[in-house]
């Protein structure tokens, strides 16, 4: 550049600075330190618009123009200082530097990759990540020399291109033509102004901006003066500077190594900003309009966002919700003492290979502006945290993955492949969000404010009976730092495999892009926008989170390492994250309930309703109804009735206010391949593998119930704590018959172990005396038939809810018992099925298909007489019931409800005459089994009933004992009454149970009994009259049972005198018929066959007094084997011990 050009550039820049940066210069002049270096940041776009010639000179000669800018800036500062009338407190500063930023966005000036040789000498903007920082050094850039001959003093500048090396001139530069070549260095007399701060950093290309397989390149950056220590390892920075070359001084026979470096003029740190995402008012207005559209049903809008999250993975609704909450993040807080509480949540995905864990990690890394994706196999502690590297004779710190992901996301795949000493190094990084380094004499602390999303495989096959720490071989301190741990079990399931295969093949054959799916850029913009929200906790959300934390602390099966204050902090972070995801600035009750439901579904929760397999979760058809179910379940269990009533009223007002509520639901049902698209729409009602357990445990909040099945995994079970919604329960079962996964749990690869799978009722345990009553009431029809019936019933129909089981008033209930509300009846109905859930066995596939076909045919048959409910509060029965069960309606219920349908078997028997019909109900069946007709019930205790399995009896003995049949009725009645005369305190507090449920087996066994009645009817005479009298007493009792359902103690004492007799005694003795003064005292006559005292009768009753049944939250899906060896015992011996 010639002198004219230099003068032009200097004048234009001086006038520009005086006009646009006068205030900045005044602030600098007010500073007291005159030797410090002060920057003035100049926007290149504005400068070039003022004068285009400056832009041309700047691009052609950047080093010379920058020196001119600095000189012009000093002149401008001096002019401003002299123009002030009162310059008190202002002083002139000599070390002023013009810092250029804001270059025009064009490929010639802005680079995202490391510059190459052709860029040498150009002023560029380069974006990268700092991976290494050196120590700050003192650089002497000028040195004075004196000629030994003429004593001329001259200045020598250090050569940047040769690592700031000083070279003495070959001859004296004096004008006196001195030819001396000997000089003396005056370094001892050099002032501090001849030195400057110097630092070298190393930047690397951003990994997310590279293509797959590309190795990120790096380059050295030179920082001087005020730019020193302006960044640290792990920072994302944009550097404005001149690309230059440098090499070591030449040596003989040594090749010259030239490297490209960037001499920085200005550094802009991008940590706090969302790099590469343009956030303007138009984008914000688009998202505000989106939530305004879903104002009536915000959960439908949230599910649309979740469906766009990793759309190549089908379903997995729970995992997508958890990942979205983790990406949204919480709020970081710092108290008055300086203690910092992290706002980032950590998520661990544990699952079998091929369950989509790595897909979620890759997608999350793509939509997060600052992210690092690594694997545990190739990462050491230095690769994850920080390492000390010796370069050019000095030690430097090089940042690892966690430091590079500061204020971003760090995805670690194969997390269990880390070595043990490497895992411990990230403890501080996960909780304190910093890394303390003391390596090679370098002691410092680096920030790791990152969200960790890790994935791991279980150690071998996942064993639900063991803890998560044992299954994945990770220590408890490390696991406790994860806010959520989701388990993905790839269990055998034909329906799930069919849906997944059709979804994948559809995308392969006919790839299509759904219009409802958000693009990746839109998802990136949304998550960058919501991370700027600062939601605050509401009082309702505080109450729910606090109450849930207290219940976790009080839980018997709590993990002491997990249920600490970290759990409460995790709940707060996740609640704030969900509020951000819903685009709100307040954490409401909806957020708290959703967070509790997700926490319950993870392995970190389970205090309320247990864990769930997050793999088989689908998007709900009605998200608002699903939330209502969650709200009822959780708030009822947390004992917050006031919040529940207020929330239900709010939901009701919301539904009434929304006129177009059906439209968002219809849109949700059409949700894209990511949730319910293609063939998957036909399977929209499919549920998790634990849906069968959900149906039997949703009402009583059993610890063993699968919480995720009912409130989380879809619309298949909308059962609230106060009973199912009327009319919907039956319809949902009918719609989900084909695509339902209800039967999956029954055909799992492992049998059931009662210790881990038996649901525990919240009511007090039933005494053994109450168990004995079940023997008289529920007679088995044969071991083989009973087991087959139980298997078919468990696999072809869900366990009945409140309205599916008849609960008429019965004598035997304690005094003062009255019909309770639907919730109590529901609890009783469910608890009656507890023994059946213990007896789950393997079933052949053919048998399952047969029962499934029968259930489908029954659903299509409109001529079947419906089952009448006992009270208006009970819902309609599920049409999936077998026809035998529907027709087997108790007689008292028919009298109460005036039903028109009659049993065909009863009509055929009653045609033989009244005495014949009465006797037919108390005879031996064909297979010599102890049976009992449902119509004749004795006094039933409120205790929990247990089914009885008796050994078969050979036909000769049955024929031999057949003649003594009538004489045995009163003795059997006496034995039953004696068993009911146990102390009342043993059965107190136990909810009444529904009648015996195995009616399909009784129906099948009843037909052969008609032929066996005839030879025994001839024994009538006096005994026939006795049976007629007993029947009249029973009918009178039935009419009074609706008014009173109690059995007086005096009657129990009288009837307790009866005892069992051997077959020989029963032939010779004829016991007197029981006399009942009051029909309500004696109860209905119960005459049934008796076995010999010498024979042992086996039962599957669990000994509640010796072993307390508990359900482990880790055994909901992989069912261990049932060993019924300790369950067999001599019932007669037990009766003699407790008369």
From Swiss-Prot:
Residues 671-693, 707-742, 776-1022, 1060-1087 are annotated as: Disordered. Keywords: ATP-binding, Chromosome, DNA damage, DNA repair, DNA-binding, Helicase, Hydrolase, Nucleotide-binding, Nucleus, Phosphoprotein. Its EC number is 3.6.4.12. It catalyses: ATP + H2O = ADP + phosphate + H(+). The keyword Signal does not apply. It is found in: Nucleus; Chromosome. Residues 781-796, 996-1008 have a biased composition (Basic and acidic residues). Residues 942-954 have a biased composition (Polar residues). Pfam families: MCM, MCM_lid, MCM_OB. GO terms for molecular function: ATP binding; ATP hydrolysis activity; helicase activity; single-stranded DNA binding. The keyword Aminoacyl-tRNA synthetase does not apply. Residues 863-880 have a biased composition (Pro residues). Residues 299-504 form the MCM domain. Component of the MCM8-MCM9 complex, a complex involved in the repair of double-stranded DNA breaks (DBSs) and DNA interstrand cross-links (ICLs) by homologous recombination (HR). Required for DNA resection by the MRE11-RAD50-NBN/NBS1 (MRN) complex by recruiting the MRN complex to the repair site and by promoting the complex nuclease activity. Probably by regulating the localization of the MRN complex, indirectly regulates the recruitment of downstream effector RAD51 to DNA damage sites including DBSs and ICLs. Component of the MCM8-MCM9 complex, which forms a hexamer composed of MCM8 and MCM9. Interacts with the DNA mismatch repair (MMR) complex composed at least of MSH2, MSH3, MSH6, PMS1 and MLH1. Interacts with MLH1; the interaction recruits MLH1 to chromatin. Interacts with MSH2; the interaction recruits MCM9 to chromatin. Interacts with MSH6. Interacts with the MRN complex composed of MRE11, RAD50 and NBN/NBS1; the interaction recruits the MRN complex to DNA damage sites. Interacts with RAD51; the interaction recruits RAD51 to DNA damage sites. Belongs to the MCM family. This is DNA helicase MCM9. It comes from Bos taurus (Bovine). The lineage of its organism: Eukaryota, Metazoa, Chordata, Craniata, Vertebrata.
């Amino acid at each position: 550049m010639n002198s004219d050009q230099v003068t032009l550039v200097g004048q234009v820049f001086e006038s520009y600075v005086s006009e646009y940066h006068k205030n900045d210069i005044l602030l600098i002049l007010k500073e007291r330190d005159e030797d410090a270096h002060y920057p003035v940041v100049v926007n290149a776009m504005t400068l070039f618009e003022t004068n285009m010639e400056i832009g041309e000179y700047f691009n052609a000669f950047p080093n010379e123009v920058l020196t001119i800018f600095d000189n012009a800036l000093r002149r401008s500062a001096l002019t401003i200082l002299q123009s002030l009338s009162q310059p008190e407190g202002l002083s002139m500063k000599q070390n002023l530097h013009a810092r250029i930023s804001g270059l025009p966005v064009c490929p010639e000036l802005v680079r995202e990759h490391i510059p190459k040789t052709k860029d040498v000498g150009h002023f560029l903007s380069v974006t990268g990540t700092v991976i290494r920082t050196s120590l700050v050094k003192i650089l002497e850039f000028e040195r004075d020399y004196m000629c030994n001959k003429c004593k001329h003093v001259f200045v020598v500048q250090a050569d940047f291109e040769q690592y700031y090396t000083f070279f003495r001139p070959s001859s004296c530069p004096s004008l006196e033509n001195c030819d001396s070549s000997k000089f003396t260095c005056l370094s001892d007399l050099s002032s501090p102004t001849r030195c400057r701060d110097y630092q070298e950093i190393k930047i690397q290309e951003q990994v997310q901006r590279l293509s797959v397989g590309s190795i990120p390149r790096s380059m050295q950056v030179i920082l001087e003066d005020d730019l020193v220590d302006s960044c640290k390892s792990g920072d994302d920075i944009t550097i404005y500077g001149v690309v230059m070359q440098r090499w070591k001084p030449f040596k003989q026979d040594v090749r010259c190594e030239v490297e490209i470096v960037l001499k920085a003029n200005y550094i802009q740190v991008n940590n706090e900003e969302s790099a590469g995402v343009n956030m303007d008012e138009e984008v914000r207005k688009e998202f505000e309009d989106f939530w305004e559209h879903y104002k009536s049903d915000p959960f439908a809008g949230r599910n649309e966002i979740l469906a766009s999250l990793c759309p190549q993975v089908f379903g997995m609704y729970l995992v997508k919700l958890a990942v979205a909450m983790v990406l949204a993040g919480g709020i970081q807080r710092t108290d008055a003492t300086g203690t910092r509480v992290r706002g980032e949540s950590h998520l661990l995905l544990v699952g079998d290979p091929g369950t989509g864990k790595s897909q979620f990690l890759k997608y999350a890394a793509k939509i997060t502006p600052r992210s690092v994706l690594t694997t545990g196999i190739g990462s050491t502690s230095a690769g994850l945290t920080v390492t000390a590297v010796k370069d050019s004779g000095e030690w430097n710190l090089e940042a690892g993955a966690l430091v590079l992901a500061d204020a971003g996301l760090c995805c670690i795949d194969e997390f269990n492949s880390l070595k043990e000493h490497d895992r411990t190094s990230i403890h501080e990084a996960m909780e304190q969000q910093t890394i303390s380094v003391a390596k090679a004499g370098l002691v410092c602390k680096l920030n790791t404010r990152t969200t960790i999303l890790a994935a791991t495989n279980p150690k071998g096959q996942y064993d639900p009976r063991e803890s998560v720490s044992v299954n994945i071989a990770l220590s408890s301190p490390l696991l406790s730092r994860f806010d959520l741990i989701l388990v993905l079990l790839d269990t055998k399931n034909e329906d799930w495999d069919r849906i997944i295969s059709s979804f994948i093949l559809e995308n392969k054959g006919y790839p299509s892009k759904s219009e409802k799916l958000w693009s990746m850029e839109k998802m990136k913009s949304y998550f960058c926008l919501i991370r700027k929200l600062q939601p605050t906790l509401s009082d309702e959300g505080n109450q729910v989170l606090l109450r849930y934390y207290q219940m976790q602390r009080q839980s018997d099966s709590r993990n002491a390492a997990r249920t600490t204050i970290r759990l409460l902090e995790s709940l707060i972070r996740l609640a704030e994250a969900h509020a951000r995801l819903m685009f709100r600035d307040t954490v409401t009750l909806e957020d708290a309930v959703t967070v509790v439901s997700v926490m319950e579904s993870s392995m970190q929760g389970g205090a309320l309703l247990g864990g769930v397999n997050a793999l088989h979760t689908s998007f709900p058809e009605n998200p608002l109804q699903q939330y209502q179910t969650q709200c009822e379940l959780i708030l009822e269990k947390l004992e917050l009735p006031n919040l529940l009533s207020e929330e239900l009223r709010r939901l009701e007002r919301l539904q009434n206010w929304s006129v177009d509520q059906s439209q968002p639901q219809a849109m949700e049902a059409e949700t894209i391949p990511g949730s319910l698209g293609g063939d998957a729409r036909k399977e929209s009602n499919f549920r998790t593998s634990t849906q069968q357990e959900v149906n039997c445990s949703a009402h009583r909040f059993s610890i063993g119930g699968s919480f995720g099945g009912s409130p989380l995994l879809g619309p298949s079970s909308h059962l609230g704590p106060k009973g199912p919604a009327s009319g919907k329960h039956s319809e949902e079962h009918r719609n989900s018959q084909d695509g339902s996964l209800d039967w999956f749990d029954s055909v799992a690869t492992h049998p059931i172990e009662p210790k881990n799978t038996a649901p525990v009722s919240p009511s007090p345990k039933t005494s053994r005396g109450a168990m004995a009553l079940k023997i008289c009431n529920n007679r088995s029809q044969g071991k083989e038939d009973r087991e087959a019936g139980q298997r078919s019933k468990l696999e072809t129909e869900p366990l009945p809810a409140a309205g599916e089981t008849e609960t008429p008033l019965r004598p035997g209930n304690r005094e003062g018992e009255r019909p309770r509300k639907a919730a109590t009846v529901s609890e009783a109905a469910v608890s009656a099925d507890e023994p059946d859930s213990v007896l789950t066995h393997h079933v052949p596939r053919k048998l399952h298909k047969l029962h499934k076909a029968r259930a489908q045919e029954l659903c299509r048959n409109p001529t079947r007489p419906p089952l009448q409910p006992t009270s208006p509060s009970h819902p309609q029965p599920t049409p999936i019931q077998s026809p035998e069960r529907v027709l087997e309606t108790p007689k008292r219920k028919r009298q109460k409800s005036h039903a028109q349908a009659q049993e065909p078997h009863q009509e055929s028997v009653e045609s033989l005459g009244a005495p014949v019909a009465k006797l037919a109900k108390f005879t031996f069946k064909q297979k010599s089994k102890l049976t009992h007709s449902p119509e004749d019930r004795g006094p039933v205790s409120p205790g929990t009933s247990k089914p009885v399995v008796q050994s078969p009896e050979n036909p000769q003995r049955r024929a031999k004992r057949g003649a003594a049949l009538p004489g045995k009725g009163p003795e059997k009645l006496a034995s039953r009454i004696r068993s009911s005369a146990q102390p009342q305190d043993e059965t107190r507090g136990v909810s009444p149970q529904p009648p015996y449920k195995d009616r399909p087996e009784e129906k099948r066994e009843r037909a052969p009994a008609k032929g066996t009645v005839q030879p025994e009817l001839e024994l009538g005479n006096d005994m026939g009259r006795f049976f007629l009298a007993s029947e009249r007493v029973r009918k009178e009792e039935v009419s009074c049972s609706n008014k009173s359902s109690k059995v007086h103690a005096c009657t129990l004492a009288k009837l307790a005198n009866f005892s069992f007799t051997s077959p020989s005694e029963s032939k010779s003795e004829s016991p007197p018929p029981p006399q009942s003064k009051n029909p309500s005292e004696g109860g209905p006559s119960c005459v049934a066959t008796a076995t010999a005292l010498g024979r042992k009768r086996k039962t599957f009753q669990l000994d509640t007094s010796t072993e307390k049944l508990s359900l482990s939250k880790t055994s909901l899906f992989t069912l261990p084997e049932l060993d019924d060896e300790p369950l067999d015992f001599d019932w007669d011996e037990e009766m003699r011990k407790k008369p």
